[in-house]
């Protein structure tokens, strides 16, 4: 018989909700559920204002400050690291959404402007602007006080705050760049060698890659794949290219990615009798993300 996992293997006990209206999202139920979410949002805002994970440091209500900082995640660490002179400015650390609106207003009332320090997209900055009126100046990535793109560093955070951090030494020139590469002995290498030999005979050949360590086939010395967008896209992009007249259109996908999100694309390609070649490069493991079991390795 086919082995199954018993419920005793689960870490937590079940806590089932038998109210079907919570789970059957017919239009009438969905409208009610959305109203419940709106009401929960008000409660979450109240919880956020009292959360120990959102806290305001260094604000003296009797003082006026040139600026204050709202920071989250690694941005908060960089603010503290850049604060080499223990400059006394208020810093609001935020750790959850919705943001603590009252704390934001309290700090903004005593500051000339607010600097938002966050990694990634300027989500918090946009939320802070929505909370504060146009009378308050908010700076951050959107104003390019911090770089609009790229990662935060202690250096660019320190520069934005105006503390002018100077590093005692630069990056050693003797350290040569080491771009990522497929491991020696990896079977993906042989796949790309073979594909390159075949593609050399077809000037219009296109090879569509997928998500996995085999994506490194786009780099030297192979330079074998022409695209990599998201998991499963290799097959659907190859089909679309073939439908548009590309020949040969070849998809390269790993075994784990194929079982994750490649099977539906292959089903559609077979159903439409698409003139494509699908290569499932099976390296017998989920190599890129930790070696965990998957339907492709069990």
Name each model-derived stretch.
Residues 9-20, 226-233, 294-298:
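Acidic, Ser/Thr-rich peripheral helices and adjacent loops at domain boundaries
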Residues 196-210:
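An acidic intrinsically disordered interaction segment
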Residues 43, 78, 99-103, 194, ...:
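Well-ordered alpha-helical segments embedded in enzymatic catalytic cores
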Residues 184-197, 231-236:
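Conserved phosphate/anionic-ligand binding catalytic regions in large, soluble enzymes, centered on
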Residues 1, 5-182, 187-188, 201:
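Flexible, low-complexity linker and terminal segments
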Residues 113, 130-134, 272-275, 282-285, ...:
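Short, well-ordered loop/turn and helix-capping segments at boundaries between secondary-structure elements
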Residues 5-12, 80-83, 103-104, 125-129, ...:
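Short acidic, glycine/serine/threonine-rich loops at helix termini
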Residues 206-287:
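Thiamine diphosphate
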């Amino acid at each position: 018989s086919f082995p199954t996992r018993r419920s005793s293997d689960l870490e937590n006990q079940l806590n089932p909700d038998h109210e079907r209206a919570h789970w059957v999202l017919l239009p009438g139920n969905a409208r009610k559920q959305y109203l419940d979410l709106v009401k929960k949002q008000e409660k979450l805002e109240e919880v956020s204002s009292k959360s120990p994970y959102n806290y305001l440091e260094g604000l003296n209500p009797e003082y006026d400050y040139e600026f204050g900082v709202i920071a989250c995640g690694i941005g908060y660490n960089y603010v503290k690291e850049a604060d080499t002179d223990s400059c006394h400015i208020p810093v609001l650390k935020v750790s959850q959404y919705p943001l603590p609106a009252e704390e934001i207003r309290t700090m903004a009332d005593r500051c000339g402007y607010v600097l938002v320090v966050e990694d990634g997209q300027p989500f918090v900055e946009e939320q802070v602007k929505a909370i504060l009126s146009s009378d308050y100046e908010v700076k951050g990535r959107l104003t390019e006080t911090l770089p609009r793109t790229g990662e935060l560093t202690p250096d660019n955070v320190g520069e934005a705050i105006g503390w002018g951090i100077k590093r005692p030494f630069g990056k050693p020139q003797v350290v040569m760049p080491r771009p990522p590469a497929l491991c020696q002995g990896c079977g993906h290498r042989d796949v790309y060698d073979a594909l390159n030999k075949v593609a050399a005979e077809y000037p219009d050949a296109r090879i569509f890659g997928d998500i996995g360590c085999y994506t490194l086939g786009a780099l030297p010395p192979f330079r074998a794949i022409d695209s990599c967008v998201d998991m499963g896209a290799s097959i659907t992009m190859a089909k679309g290219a073939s439908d548009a007249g590309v020949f040969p259109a070849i998809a390269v996908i790993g075994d784990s990615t194929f079982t994750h999100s490649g099977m539906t694309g292959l089903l559609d390609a077979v159903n439409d009798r698409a003139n494509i070649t699908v290569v499932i490069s099976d390296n017998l493991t989920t190599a890129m993300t930790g070696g965990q079991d998957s339907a492709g390795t069990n």
